[in-house]
Curated annotation (Swiss-Prot):
Family, similarity comment: Belongs to the bacterial ring-hydroxylating dioxygenase alpha subunit family.
One Gene Ontology term from the biological process aspect of the record: 3-phenylpropionate catabolic process
Cofactor remark: Binds 1 Fe cation. Binds 1 [2Fe-2S] cluster per subunit.
Species in which this protein is naturally found: Shigella flexneri serotype 5b (strain 8401)
Single GO MF annotation: 2 iron, 2 sulfur cluster binding
Reactions it catalyzes: 3-phenylpropanoate + NADH + O2 + H(+) = 3-(cis-5,6-dihydroxycyclohexa-1,3-dien-1-yl)propanoate + NAD(+); (E)-cinnamate + NADH + O2 + H(+) = (2E)-3-(cis-5,6-dihydroxycyclohexa-1,3-dien-1-yl)prop-2-enoate + NAD(+)
Protein's UniProt name: 3-phenylpropionate/cinnamic acid dioxygenase subunit alpha
Summary of the function given for this chain in its UniProt record: Part of the multicomponent 3-phenylpropionate dioxygenase. Converts 3-phenylpropionic acid (PP) and cinnamic acid (CI) into 3-phenylpropionate-dihydrodiol (PP-dihydrodiol) and cinnamic acid-dihydrodiol (CI-dihydrodiol), respectively.
Residues bound to Fe cation: H213, H218
Pathway given in the UniProt record: Aromatic compound metabolism; 3-phenylpropanoate degradation
Lineage: Bacteria, Pseudomonadati, Pseudomonadota, Gammaproteobacteria, Enterobacterales
């Protein structure tokens, strides 16, 4: 059995000097350890409460590569179970979502209540004349399930920090999407799913730490939507302009702490996002006063940027995109993307949000294709022996981290930096190399203290 010491994790990651060895994106032994020590120990996004509003409502998803079903209980609480019959390991729930009174295995017909209890075994008296203790054979329950402002998370590890502590300061940034208006948020439409042939850490890192790529990877989109030859702004309708936000923002920052990451621009207009639909832009202007009252000016204006909760929950504020990177091996990830909107928005505005999210970041989105192509090409190159063992530079903004005194929390840097990426890989290495969560937390504290010297 391969152990963390066999893999020499800390020789592959050097966050103090900004180095990473790309074998971390290709090694199957590392991937198996990730399934155990990251996806088996971290809080993972399961669903939004709006997707399962009534008792018996369920939603099927994954925790790493483990299929799980999330179910609203009769008392309104939420449980999650391994989607696996206890008889011969068959899946018991197949529909993406729906409402049910029971989950019945199609192999031998064992049936489970929405509370996970085994309630029926076909031909039980004849098949088990010695008796069967059904109370012992219920579905395996995810022991830790908590919600944060509508987002449901699960964790297999009962020794892990609670969700509130796990999120830490990233919750302040997350509230900029979840808490703009009274009533919170909801998921609009279904889930778009597709597969990208790359390691899960590429998209997670980009959403945590990488605004730098947008100037170059998305150059064609910027050229099409950007300023006219005379320097004036193109008009997109409803008063919206298309000048890239990095040309007009007065400042910008990146946040990187506890493995999480975020970055955004300080803008002066409540519609400063080049990628959104005109109706969405108008909606942001019309609701700005409420958002500012609830969140303050900085977060109310924050419509452009990037975010990731370690390991695999990402979102983009202005385009209302919420996405999960489900790992499917060391060289493949399955993307699930949701459109998340204010519940108080009109149906017309919600439809405009959905159109904007799909247009830019759907499976055929004009920005999504740029990103996917980058990640796939990197993964192809890393098949080479020298390529996957040649150290990469992770030095951007190294040593420039600071804590702000204006109420914006956490370890920050200028937006064009890799503070969040270094923090993400440090948390990644600490999880893989530690036997307990307390050991992880101690290592994180020591790293962050060193960063802020």
């Amino acid at each position: 059995m391969t152990t963390p010491s066999d893999l020499n994790i800390y020789q592959l990651i050097d966050t103090q000097n900004g180095r990473v060895t790309p074998r971390i994106y290709t090694d199957p032994d590392i991937y198996q350890l990730e399934l155990e020590r990251i996806f088996g120990r971290c809080w993972l996004f399961l669903a939004h409460e709006s997707q399962i509003p009534k008792p018996g409502d369920f939603f099927n998803t994954y925790m790493g590569e483990d299929a799980v079903v999330v179910v609203r209980q009769k008392d309104g609480s939420i449980k999650a179970f391994l989607n696996q019959c206890r008889h011969r390991a068959m899946r018991v729930s197949y529909a993406d979502c729906g409402n049910t009174r029971a989950f019945t295995c199609p192999y031998h017909g064992w049936s489970y209540g929405i509370n996970g209890e085994l309630i029926d075994v076909p031909l039980e008296p004849r098949a088990y004349p010695q008796g069967l203790c059904k109370s012992h054979w219920g579905l395996n329950e995810v022991p830790c399930v908590e919600s944060y402002k509508g987002l449901i998370f699960g964790n297999w590890d009962t020794s892990a920090p609670g969700l509130h502590d796990y999120l830490g300061d990233i919750a302040w940034y997350l509230d900029g999407m979840l808490d703009r208006r009274e009533g919170g948020t909801e998921i609009v439409g279904g889930v778009q799913k597709w597969v990208i042939n790359c390691n899960w850490k590429f998209p997670a890192e980009q959403f945590a730490s990488d605004q730098y790529h947008a100037l170059f990877s998305h150059a064609s989109a910027v050229q099409v939507l950007g300023a006219k030859d005379d320097g004036s702004d193109k008009r997109l309708g409803d008063g919206q302009t298309a000048r890239p936000v990095w040309e007009t923002a007065k400042d910008a920052l990146q946040f990187g702490q506890d493995g999480h990451g975020s970055g955004f621009f300080f803008t002066e207009k409540p519609d400063a996002n080049v990628w959104v639909d005109g109706a969405v832009s108008s909606y942001y202007r019309e609701t700005y006063a409420e958002a500012e009252q609830r969140l303050g000016e900085v977060r109310a204006l924050r419509l452009a940027g990037h975010n990731n909760i370690f390991p695999t929950l990402s979102w983009l504020n202005g385009t209302a995109t919420l996405r999960v990177w489900h790992p499917r091996g060391p060289d493949q990830v399955e993307v699930w993307t949701f459109c998340i909107t204010d519940k108080a928005a009109s149906d017309e505005v919600k439809a405009a949000f959905e159109n904007s999210a799909t247009r830019a970041f759907g499976p055929a989105g004009f920005l999504e294709q740029d990103d996917s192509e980058n990640w796939c090409e990197i993964q192809k190159l890393l098949k080479g022996h020298r390529a996957r063992n040649s150290k990469l530079c992770l030095e951007m903004g190294l040593g420039q981290e600071k804590r702000r005194d204006d109420g914006i929390p956490g370890i920050t840097n200028y937006i064009f930096s890799e503070t969040a990426a270094r923090g993400m890989y440090q948390r990644w290495a600490d999880l893989l190399s530690s036997e307990s969560w307390q050991e992880v937390l101690d290592k994180t504290a020591a790293y962050q203290q060193e960063v802020m010297k």
